[in-house]
Amino acid sequence: MKFLHLADLHLGKRVNGFDLLEDQRYILEQILALCDSNKVDAVVLAGDIYDAPVPPAPACTLLDWFLTQLAARRIAVLAVSGNHDSAERLDYAAGLLANQNVYIAGQFRGAPRQIVLNDRFGPVEFTLLPFVRAATVRHYMPEADLPDYDSAVAAALSACAPSAERRVLVAHQMVVAGLCPPQLSGSETAPLTVGTVDSVDAAHFAGFSYTALGHIHRAQRVGSDTVRYAGAPLCYHLDECGTEKSATLVRLGRRGVDGIDTLPLHPRRAMRHIVGPLAKLVEHPADTGDYIWATLTDPTPQPDAMAVLRAAYPNAMRLDYRPQGAEILPADTAQSVRGKPFASLFEDFFTQMNGRPLTVEEARAVKALREEASK
């Protein structure tokens, strides 16, 4: 059996105000071509199918088209909800869709859904575990001792008995290998407690031939070659610029995984980060249709900078300043800034943008403006 592992489609997503629906359709057409050329038997969608609990109507139409194309090819679909999805809405018509070999597990109902597909070697069990919170598991298991997220997910998995030797888990969770968290991107919503109470140890998946994960937008293995995040099929953030997106092709043999291939995906428009003075960036623009994140190194803000940039790059998404010579400081996290006084936050920001601290006079002016604004 061959199946394609996908995740984090985020249909309907907008990045800096840009609607990416046509880009998403373009990449789904590529995925269908990969299904055809590799003669896959199934497609796994490991959560965050939509970008929002109430997706825009065109996103729903796009998913309908994609599932219809797969069903017409007699390719089974095994999908779970993610933290961005509405589990209840994703479950709509799930029973009817199952008649077309489209199996969707939106809500957790006390145990993962188990689907058995067959190939020439016999049955393959797909265990579908949607994104679930510890409180939801406790609701179904009130007598169990489930002190944290890890124990709750472990209990959820133990609620179903294996029905085949070859087993594939489909899940949308934050998974770590021991104390090693996955490599995050700026576009996914990840808990600040990665590696502690809001993560799941990959050791719980030892009984599965392959674990198909969603939630993290960079394709990567988690401790083992057979525990993997597929990653998002498109770049959705500045720090994903330059990363190669892919779909994961898994081949199952008689005893388990026979091979795993990473199949490159090529976007309709690349997402790029360009750095330099505004005049230089627009002097000889290249690949002008790309999505552009620009960092200007001009010593002072430039008049109508975004308008000038978009005259050269119509799809310029965002513009930031980092004057030449300014110290590049690590980005603040929510944890590092929480509780910090306004004056300290502003001074850190000013230093990062200008390469020098506030003078005494500037600090006084900022304080006065702050007090005036608070009245």
Short names for language-model regions:
Residues G12-K13, D51-P53, V80-L90, G110-R113, ...:
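Active-site environment of divalent metal-dependent phosphoester hydrolases
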Residues A177, P181-D258:
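Conserved beta-sheet core of the metallophosphoesterase superfamily
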Residues S37, A42, R251-K375:
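Accessory, non-catalytic peripheral segments of nucleic-acid enzymes
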Residues M1-T68, A72, A363, A368-K375:
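N-terminal active-site segment of His-dependent metallophosphoesterases
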Residues P112-E125, L129, V227-Y291:
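Binuclear metal-dependent phosphoesterase catalytic core
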Residues L6-A7, V43-D48, A76-N83, Y103-F108, ...:
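Active-site neighborhood of phospho(di)ester-bond hydrolases with catalytic His/Asp-centered motifs
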Residues V15-N16, I49-F66, S81-N101, G106, ...:
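Metal-dependent catalytic neighborhoods of phosphoester/phosphodiester hydrolases
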Residues Y92-V194, P233, G253:
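Conserved catalytic scaffold of divalent metal-dependent phosphoesterases
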